[in-house]
């Protein structure tokens, strides 16, 4: 397992466990439009990735992070990978708070994971690889987000766009 991928999985999983052991901790981490825009709790744009709605939510996100993280981190390096992950999470959070109601609470790292899919598209195109499977996986995940209530598809879309843009900029030939 690549070092930054391992670190992210360890920290996110550790916070999930901490939230189980310390009731009320999650309330200081999750994303909510009112808390960010009206109370200035901007840390939530990133800390939302440390929270999850259950063990299966955590498992699926960490599995996706493991698969995408190892591949991308190997291809683009630790610093750029971490930058894309964090930028994607911020983009996901901004999309969520600007396009959701004030009372909506959002949890999870899936916005950042979708950002990694956006980065994977950029990397795949750069190396002339087929992107059809990536588009299919993204489409299936968006469909799930529309079918099942409580999934923040706005964050997924924001993360995907932010990851694509971040990778396009960070991996441009003049920056590489």
PLM region descriptions:
Residues 74-79, 83, 120-135, 171-176:
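Alpha-helical transmembrane bundle and helix-membrane interface signal
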Residues 97-115, 119-123, 127-128, 145, ...:
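Transmembrane helix-loop-helix hairpins at the membrane interface
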Residues 1-4, 10-13, 132, 142-176:
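C-terminal transmembrane module of polytopic alpha-helical membrane proteins
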Residues 1-107, 148-151:
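N-terminal TM1-TM2 helical hairpin plus the immediately adjacent luminal interfacial "cap"
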Residues 87-88, 133-142:
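Central hydrophobic cores of alpha-helical transmembrane segments
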Residues 24, 97-98, 128, 164, ...:
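Membrane-embedded alpha-helical segments of multi-pass transporters/permeases
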Residues 58-65, 107-119, 152-171:
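Alpha-helical transmembrane segments that form the membrane-embedded catalytic/substrate-binding core
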């Amino acid at each position: 397992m690549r070092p930054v991928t391992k670190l992210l999985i360890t920290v996110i999983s550790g916070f999930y466990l901490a939230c189980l052991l310390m009731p009320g901790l999650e309330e200081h981490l999750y994303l909510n439009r009112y808390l960010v825009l009206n109370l200035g709790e901007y840390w939530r744009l990133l800390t939302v990735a440390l929270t999850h709605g259950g063990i299966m939510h955590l498992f699926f996100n960490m599995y996706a992070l493991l698969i995408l993280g190892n591949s991308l981190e190997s291809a683009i390096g630790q610093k750029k990978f971490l930058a894309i992950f964090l930028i994607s999470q911020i983009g996901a959070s901004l999309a969520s708070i600007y396009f959701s109601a004030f009372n909506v609470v959002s949890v999870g790292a899936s916005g950042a994971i979708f950002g990694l899919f956006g980065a994977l598209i950029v990397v795949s195109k750069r190396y002339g690889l087929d992107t059809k499977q990536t588009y299919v996986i993204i489409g299936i995940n968006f469909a799930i987000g529309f079918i099942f209530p409580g999934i923040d598809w706005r964050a997924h879309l924001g993360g995907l766009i932010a990851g694509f843009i971040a990778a396009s900029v960070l991996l441009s030939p003049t920056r590489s």
